[in-house]
């Protein structure tokens, strides 16, 4: 039947079945118990994103892959945890092995350059007087004192458990003398009167390093002592608003950890790495964006607790990763960026964030750098011909006139042996630079320094860094560097071989 407009007309007796059929079809499309399409919840934060499903089967290759990444990521954290544990055992501030300042929840200061027998950390320097300590801020916040250093360069570096520096305390920041409070991530107490500022760490475990410049004269060694005696870190409960004075020359001595290695004390054991990692991860919260990484690693650690074969694979992976991933970082060419003329330099030291490559590389080769605006580090193992430096040769390092490292603080060139430690020598000399008052400049105003096992000649010995008879490396420090160093405009000099190897 059609209407006058040509439309088809459905007879009344047929309408009801058609409507019923349409409803049934619509219902079948929507599904049981629903009336419209539903949107799955969209995660609004990392905690709402599902992680690996518990109990899922894991292949050996998968466990190796996760274990390898976890080893690279976690190596600096385990390193810090083991150093802090060693320091926590000392009853009071003192000297570890009679050499290294050691303290927990306080600080210990040296009164002179660090001894060449130091093996606690690689790449020490003899341009500053060191203070060092670890602390657990969950126990109690710490107060630290800043004396009036006058024109002298100084810097306090405060690091979290990842070796990221969370402080800006020093000469280059214009820090005022006074009392400062260092607190952990969960502290919500009241700030007592007399505190100049508060610094908050992202983690409860922190490392504290004080560096105060001293030149190599007897006069400056005497002049610095009253300043050193005013440096102090101590629990908030001991704060009374008065500057505490300490005679650091009377520190007790404690035995150093026993080590069979000739190099740095071994702070990471691959065979126990994955036994320690769960505890460390619980004490070091994930950075924003790291939540998925934590879940990924946790899932394999949980599986290893239930399956001996997975645990065995993780241990094997750690041992292999120590050799394949970590050991190569000890070569300077594998650290940072090329800085010119065969040298390398990091650009984000002590501000690593999620840069696991450079953080772990530095933790292996020269742990506890300062931030670039505090210190610029430039290093090499090779000469101008890309050949490994060797003390059997004599090398010259010439800075053209006006081209010594441009700094507002000071600069130095340090020589290290194959272990990135000092090479004991009869001159008791390990670095040359601003601190040295007897450097001899060339007639054209340039400065040539020498490195090698044998003297370059009596007339050049003031400019000579004695080297071992084997491999060694060179290391430039530029404290409070000018922009030309920070942006790479200034280039370090070539290391030129002057004579062939001795028979």
Language-model features: locations:
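Bacterial N-terminal signal peptides that target proteins for export
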Residues: 7-19
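A compositional/structural signature for long, glycine/proline-rich flexible linkers
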Residues: 38-503
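C-terminal segment of classical bacterial N-terminal signal peptides
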Residues: 26-34
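Residues at the start of alpha-helices and the adjacent loop-to-helix junctions
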Residues: 15, 29, 59-62
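Hydrophobic alpha-helical targeting segments used for export or membrane insertion
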Residues: 18-27
